[in-house]
Amino acid sequence: FIYSKDNQFSITTTPIANADFGLQSGPLLIKDQALMPLKIINDEGRRRVIATLTPQNQLIFITIVSKDSEFNGPLLAETPQVLEIIGQKINQDFDVAINLDGGSASAFYTPQTYIKEFSPIGSYFCY
């Protein structure tokens, strides 16, 4: 996940020379609007925090939780399919999506939504 000096966001596996900052994360969930097949050993249902880019290069952060608990969510291997369903429900295509974090040491704050961490977290990404 990269923010470049020309005010553009990128989610790529290729280094970008003019990056202002970047985050190492993964795995990629969607690439070139195609769902990525994931095989995860010891996969568990956890809250998922995802960064996506639309065809218009709009950055969207998505947090996926279960209906029963803010700390549970889909298996990581199921997350690309869950994103596809979300995209259909909100009528939005995703060019690319990457898993940022999830589980008990993740949080999500906006003026409308607050999902707190269960375990203390070491840092925040503010956008």
Where are these regions (language model features)?
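Gly/Ser/Thr/Pro-rich low-complexity, intrinsically disordered segments
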Residues: 1-127
